[in-house]
Amino acid sequence: MTDQKLVTVIDYGMGNLRSVAKAAEHAADSNTRICISDKAEDIRSADAIIFPGQGAAKACMKALNETNITHALIQAATEKPFLGICMGLQVLMTHSQENEGVDCLDILKGDVQKFDLSGHPELKMPHMGWNQIHQTIDHPLWHNIEQNSRFYFVHSYFVSPHDKQIIAGETTHGKRFTSAIAQNNLFAIQAHPEKSADAGLQLFKNFLNWNGQ
Protein backbone atom coordinates (compact mmCIF):
# COMPACT_ATOMS: atom_id res chain seq x y z
CA MET A 1 0.00 0.00 0.00
CA THR A 2 1.36 3.40 -0.97
CA ASP A 3 1.84 5.96 1.79
CA GLN A 4 -0.67 8.78 1.64
CA LYS A 5 0.66 12.16 0.53
CA LEU A 6 0.02 14.96 3.04
CA VAL A 7 -0.43 18.52 1.78
CA THR A 8 -0.71 21.24 4.42
CA VAL A 9 -2.57 24.48 3.70
CA ILE A 10 -1.04 27.01 6.09
CA ASP A 11 -3.56 28.73 8.35
CA TYR A 12 -2.41 32.04 9.78
CA GLY A 13 -5.78 33.77 9.63
CA MET A 14 -5.13 35.67 6.40
CA GLY A 15 -6.44 33.59 3.52
CA ASN A 16 -9.66 32.15 2.13
CA LEU A 17 -8.43 28.79 3.36
CA ARG A 18 -11.62 26.82 2.80
CA SER A 19 -11.82 27.80 -0.86
CA VAL A 20 -8.15 26.93 -1.40
CA ALA A 21 -8.45 23.62 0.45
CA LYS A 22 -11.65 22.69 -1.43
CA ALA A 23 -10.03 23.44 -4.78
CA ALA A 24 -6.98 21.37 -3.83
CA GLU A 25 -9.20 18.51 -2.65
CA HIS A 26 -11.09 18.64 -5.94
CA ALA A 27 -7.80 18.36 -7.82
CA ALA A 28 -6.31 15.67 -5.57
CA ASP A 29 -6.32 11.94 -6.16
CA SER A 30 -7.44 9.40 -3.55
CA ASN A 31 -3.91 9.05 -2.22
CA THR A 32 -3.57 12.71 -1.27
CA ARG A 33 -4.85 14.26 1.95
CA ILE A 34 -5.31 18.02 2.26
CA CYS A 35 -5.21 19.49 5.77
CA ILE A 36 -5.47 23.05 7.08
CA SER A 37 -3.16 23.80 9.98
CA ASP A 38 -1.50 26.59 11.95
CA LYS A 39 0.99 24.22 13.62
CA ALA A 40 4.69 24.13 12.82
CA GLU A 41 4.80 20.34 13.20
CA ASP A 42 2.17 19.94 10.45
CA ILE A 43 4.29 22.09 8.16
CA ARG A 44 7.38 20.01 8.92
CA SER A 45 5.62 16.67 8.44
CA ALA A 46 3.86 17.64 5.20
CA ASP A 47 5.00 16.38 1.82
CA ALA A 48 3.96 19.66 0.19
CA ILE A 49 2.84 23.11 1.32
CA ILE A 50 0.19 25.53 0.06
CA PHE A 51 0.66 29.07 1.41
CA PRO A 52 -2.40 31.22 0.63
CA GLY A 53 -3.03 34.76 1.78
CA GLN A 54 -5.03 37.90 1.31
CA GLY A 55 -5.17 41.27 3.00
CA ALA A 56 -2.30 43.65 3.81
CA ALA A 57 1.38 42.76 4.10
CA LYS A 58 1.78 44.19 7.61
CA ALA A 59 -1.17 42.21 8.96
CA CYS A 60 0.07 39.05 7.25
CA MET A 61 3.56 39.33 8.72
CA LYS A 62 2.11 40.09 12.17
CA ALA A 63 -0.15 37.03 11.95
CA LEU A 64 2.73 34.80 10.82
CA ASN A 65 4.92 35.94 13.69
CA GLU A 66 2.13 35.46 16.23
CA THR A 67 1.50 31.87 15.14
CA ASN A 68 5.20 30.98 15.57
CA ILE A 69 5.37 29.16 12.23
CA THR A 70 7.77 31.49 10.42
CA HIS A 71 10.86 29.29 10.87
CA ALA A 72 9.03 26.14 9.75
CA LEU A 73 7.56 28.03 6.79
CA ILE A 74 10.95 29.34 5.64
CA GLN A 75 12.46 25.87 5.99
CA ALA A 76 9.63 24.28 4.00
CA ALA A 77 10.02 26.87 1.23
CA THR A 78 13.54 25.58 0.58
CA GLU A 79 12.92 21.84 1.03
CA LYS A 80 9.58 20.61 -0.34
CA PRO A 81 7.05 21.44 -3.07
CA PHE A 82 5.69 24.84 -2.08
CA LEU A 83 2.86 26.85 -3.67
CA GLY A 84 2.35 30.50 -2.70
CA ILE A 85 -0.91 32.22 -3.62
CA CYS A 86 -1.58 35.99 -3.80
CA MET A 87 -0.24 37.44 -0.52
CA GLY A 88 1.48 34.08 -0.15
CA LEU A 89 3.64 35.25 -3.06
CA GLN A 90 4.18 38.81 -1.89
CA VAL A 91 5.41 38.08 1.64
CA LEU A 92 8.05 35.71 0.26
CA MET A 93 9.92 38.81 -0.90
CA THR A 94 12.38 40.96 1.04
CA HIS A 95 10.31 44.11 1.50
CA SER A 96 6.88 45.53 0.65
CA GLN A 97 5.96 49.17 0.05
CA GLU A 98 2.54 48.51 1.56
CA ASN A 99 1.65 50.01 4.96
CA GLU A 100 4.51 52.54 4.67
CA GLY A 101 7.02 49.71 4.35
CA VAL A 102 7.06 46.16 5.72
CA ASP A 103 9.92 43.71 6.07
CA CYS A 104 8.80 40.36 4.68
CA LEU A 105 10.16 36.81 4.85
CA ASP A 106 13.14 37.44 2.53
CA ILE A 107 12.91 33.96 1.03
CA LEU A 108 13.17 35.59 -2.40
CA LYS A 109 15.20 38.74 -2.93
CA GLY A 110 13.00 41.50 -4.24
CA ASP A 111 10.39 44.14 -3.50
CA VAL A 112 6.62 44.49 -3.56
CA GLN A 113 5.51 47.67 -5.33
CA LYS A 114 2.22 49.48 -5.81
CA PHE A 115 0.72 49.80 -9.28
CA ASP A 116 1.26 53.18 -10.92
CA LEU A 117 -1.71 53.65 -13.24
CA SER A 118 -0.92 57.23 -14.27
CA GLY A 119 -1.65 57.57 -17.96
CA HIS A 120 -4.23 54.78 -17.78
CA PRO A 121 -7.50 56.43 -16.64
CA GLU A 122 -9.45 53.45 -17.96
CA LEU A 123 -7.82 51.11 -15.43
CA LYS A 124 -8.83 50.70 -11.81
CA MET A 125 -7.19 49.84 -8.52
CA PRO A 126 -7.21 47.21 -7.24
CA HIS A 127 -6.46 45.08 -10.27
CA MET A 128 -9.55 42.90 -9.95
CA GLY A 129 -11.01 40.32 -12.30
CA TRP A 130 -9.83 38.05 -15.08
CA ASN A 131 -6.55 38.64 -16.87
CA GLN A 132 -4.07 36.64 -18.90
CA ILE A 133 -0.85 35.15 -17.61
CA HIS A 134 1.89 34.91 -20.21
CA GLN A 135 4.08 31.94 -19.29
CA THR A 136 7.72 33.04 -19.57
CA ILE A 137 9.29 29.64 -18.82
CA ASP A 138 8.44 26.01 -19.33
CA HIS A 139 7.50 24.68 -15.89
CA PRO A 140 5.67 21.57 -14.61
CA LEU A 141 2.99 23.76 -13.03
CA TRP A 142 2.07 25.16 -16.45
CA HIS A 143 1.48 21.65 -17.83
CA ASN A 144 -1.78 21.48 -19.84
CA ILE A 145 -2.47 25.18 -19.21
CA GLU A 146 -2.62 27.09 -22.49
CA GLN A 147 -0.36 30.08 -23.04
CA ASN A 148 -2.10 33.34 -22.03
CA SER A 149 -4.81 31.53 -20.06
CA ARG A 150 -6.98 33.78 -17.93
CA PHE A 151 -6.75 33.73 -14.14
CA TYR A 152 -8.61 35.70 -11.47
CA PHE A 153 -6.74 38.55 -9.72
CA VAL A 154 -7.45 40.83 -6.75
CA HIS A 155 -4.47 43.01 -5.74
CA SER A 156 -3.00 46.52 -5.69
CA TYR A 157 0.67 45.54 -5.32
CA PHE A 158 2.95 43.32 -7.38
CA VAL A 159 6.31 41.64 -6.86
CA SER A 160 9.55 42.75 -8.49
CA PRO A 161 12.17 40.02 -7.95
CA HIS A 162 15.82 41.03 -8.21
CA ASP A 163 16.60 37.87 -10.17
CA LYS A 164 14.53 38.09 -13.35
CA GLN A 165 15.40 34.46 -14.14
CA ILE A 166 12.84 33.29 -11.55
CA ILE A 167 9.94 35.00 -13.33
CA ALA A 168 7.55 32.29 -14.53
CA GLY A 169 4.64 34.41 -15.68
CA GLU A 170 3.78 38.00 -16.56
CA THR A 171 0.52 39.93 -16.81
CA THR A 172 -0.33 43.41 -18.06
CA HIS A 173 -2.26 45.98 -16.03
CA GLY A 174 -1.06 49.37 -17.21
CA LYS A 175 2.43 47.87 -17.31
CA ARG A 176 3.73 44.35 -17.54
CA PHE A 177 4.29 42.86 -14.08
CA THR A 178 5.46 39.58 -12.59
CA SER A 179 2.45 37.37 -11.88
CA ALA A 180 4.24 34.08 -11.16
CA ILE A 181 7.68 33.05 -9.96
CA ALA A 182 9.49 29.71 -9.83
CA GLN A 183 12.68 28.84 -7.99
CA ASN A 184 13.73 25.24 -7.35
CA ASN A 185 10.97 23.61 -5.25
CA LEU A 186 8.96 26.83 -4.93
CA PHE A 187 6.25 28.21 -7.21
CA ALA A 188 4.10 31.22 -6.38
CA ILE A 189 1.36 33.01 -8.25
CA GLN A 190 -0.29 36.41 -7.78
CA ALA A 191 -3.65 35.23 -9.10
CA HIS A 192 -6.13 33.08 -7.19
CA PRO A 193 -6.15 29.61 -8.79
CA GLU A 194 -9.01 28.60 -6.47
CA LYS A 195 -11.15 31.22 -8.28
CA SER A 196 -9.75 30.60 -11.77
CA ALA A 197 -11.98 27.82 -13.12
CA ASP A 198 -10.32 25.16 -15.30
CA ALA A 199 -6.90 26.82 -15.48
CA GLY A 200 -6.76 27.14 -11.71
CA LEU A 201 -7.86 23.56 -11.16
CA GLN A 202 -5.18 22.35 -13.56
CA LEU A 203 -2.56 24.37 -11.67
CA PHE A 204 -3.57 22.62 -8.44
CA LYS A 205 -3.44 19.24 -10.17
CA ASN A 206 0.02 20.02 -11.50
CA PHE A 207 1.22 21.11 -8.08
CA LEU A 208 -0.10 18.00 -6.35
CA ASN A 209 1.69 15.82 -8.92
CA TRP A 210 4.93 17.82 -8.71
CA ASN A 211 8.01 16.53 -6.91
CA GLY A 212 9.54 19.98 -6.59
CA GLN A 213 12.07 19.61 -9.40
Swiss-Prot record:
Disulfide bridge map: none
Gene3D superfamilies registered for this protein in UniProt: 3.40.50.880
GO cellular component, one term: cytoplasm
EC number(s) reported in the record: 4.3.2.10, 3.5.1.2
Subcellular location: Cytoplasm
Alphabetized UniProt keyword annotations: Amino-acid biosynthesis, Cytoplasm, Glutamine amidotransferase, Histidine biosynthesis, Hydrolase, Lyase
The protein's annotated pathway: Amino-acid biosynthesis; L-histidine biosynthesis; L-histidine from 5-phospho-alpha-D-ribose 1-diphosphate: step 5/9
Any GO BP annotation: L-histidine biosynthetic process
PANTHER family reported for this sequence: IMIDAZOLE GLYCEROL PHOSPHATE SYNTHASE SUBUNIT HISH, IMIDAZOLE GLYCEROL PHOSPHATE SYNTHASE SUBUNIT HISH 1
The protein's role, per its UniProt record: IGPS catalyzes the conversion of PRFAR and glutamine to IGP, AICAR and glutamate. The HisH subunit catalyzes the hydrolysis of glutamine to glutamate and ammonia as part of the synthesis of IGP and AICAR. The resulting ammonia molecule is channeled to the active site of HisF.
Subunit: Heterodimer of HisH and HisF.
UniProt name for this protein: Imidazole glycerol phosphate synthase subunit HisH
Gene: hisH
